[in-house]
Amino acid sequence: MSFCMGAVFVLAQNGADSVDVGLQQMKGLTVTEKVLPAAVRSGAPVQTLDKAELERMGVLDVSDAVRHFSGVTLKDYGGVGGLKTVSVRSLGAQHTAVLYDGVAIGDCQSGQVDISRFSLDNVSSLTLTIGQSDNIYQTARMSAAASALSIETSRPDFENRDFSLSAKVKTGSYGLANPSLFYAHRFTSRLSCSLYGEYLRADGNYHFTMMNLTKPIEGRRNNSDIGAYRAEVNLFARLTERQDLDVKGYLFDSRRGLPGSVVYDNPYAAERLYDRNYFGQLRYENRFSEKWKLKASGKFNYSWNKDTDKKAAGPTEDRFRQTETYLTATLWATPVKNLSFSLAQDFVYNDLATTLEECQYPERYTSLTAFSAQYHHPLFQVTASLLNTFITERVALGRAADDRKRLSPAVSLTWRPVKKASWRLRASYKDIFRVPTFNDLYYLLIGNSRLRPEKTRQWNVGTTWAGRMGRVADYLSLSVDGYYNEVDDKIVAVPTMFVWKMSNVGKVETYGVDVNLAAEWTLAKAWNLGMTAAYSFMQAEDVTKRSSKLWRHQIAYTPKHSGAGGLVLETPWVNAAYNVAWSGERYRLPQNKESNLIDAYADHSVSLYRVFQFKGHKLRLQVDAANLGGENYEVVRYYPMPGRNFKVAITYSL
């Protein structure tokens, strides 16, 4: 099969939107039931990596894959077990929803989802949507986010047998050991299940060199180990020809050290973090007819963590427990040709308990109602939605936050100027807000229950094109988007007379450009070359007060220039992949002065892999070399990343 970055975009299009990529490129491709987002014809920016692309790129972690999306800032605290969160177009990680098999993952305490919790081994696709999705057959919670990272897990592929099996072992530098197992069984033509289990451990004791002003610091990261278990069970039932039911159970348990920031002449670190996360979710769908369908989901999530430390003043131990109950239903209808509507209703209940002094034991009740409409014409498509949000909270002690009500509109348009061409123009607008987290509202001393929601407005205009380029390329796809964002009532910590306090004092303006390019060339028989490139320009400025010394300063941890790229060469003997992720200079604090500057970096990696097949068995061998430059660059100041490191992965499939 030829390498085709962006083939997913072609497969997702209908007949009127198809792109001629030639019989040679399409030979051997199989269209599955799961249709991925058609980024080329979307009214809002959508970027997708499917399993085949991830394997060709040699990517082994979710965080490494996300780096290839334009507009993304990955906050990485380093090491195998370091916290990794995703911010899109400088809005902050709290504005990025993370969905797992279509159901949102919530964290009412911090509002941030650590994507290092998820494995790439059982993932079928990663999709980043910025703004409002063209898919109106979705949950109301999806409409309530400024952007969304959707993680879809693999469904069983049985072919000519009633079971499938995949075993994988990864090992590498710093004591990495990461075995995993995926097994699926088909009981009947209508009932099947899958099981996935994984163990991860690493010492994380890597050497680093960094500068402290003018003095070099050399040492090893201490207390940077991790031990984690992941397990997942799925049940897939086709109740009738029109009804499906999926049930999922998930478990994550980890123990890790928190090395903290590097302190000159003080390598001591003893903080430990223990995490347990369990959830169960189900999805039901009924396709009543070609004009009506309904899907509903339910989820219960339990999250517990313990933070311990051995300080000079004495040991500390804090425990946190949060739960979430989530119910959602979406009705979709197309009463007349080319016009469709949807109505989605979500209910969310959250609660938090901690061992901290004066814990207020907050509870939150959220109702989200989204009405959407879409009109599709061969030359253009218009999508509009209106989201109604109502939130009320209760606390056992102290003052609860006020009730919140808001209507949030969104609209997108895509236009095809030439009917037989794959060139499109698009524009979108979305008004949305994020509610303060429980930490923002109720955390000991710094919490402020009078906080207002953080409001955002997003504008995007862009163009996309995909197709053949004659002798230039067998396949080429290009998207260019310019955008402007406003954030009002930004929630930040500000100093008071005695302590820091969360307050609504910030306003941020962001404008930028995202560019995505993918191409494929057939060099000779069984020789293929693929290329991807992503570039982002992002000017995110503090415009809170004209008289402030921070006026028009770039906000912290937001590079003006960043990007990623990849080359894949497929040959009859071995395949090679080269990937690079780079970031320009950033500032660690709001004030843009030299002492706050974090250097630019580029992370280069190379993968070599070969797949052997014999009598229904498949064996894949892969060797990776990451951070070839060996630089201990910093994504977060004083948290140096590992230098040059290596991984070996062996995968057996049956």
What are the functions of these language-model segments?
Residues 120-166:
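A beta-strand signature from Gram-negative outer-membrane beta-barrel systems
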Residues 291-307, 425-428, 454-511, 516-520:
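Membrane-embedded beta-barrel scaffold of Gram-negative outer-membrane proteins
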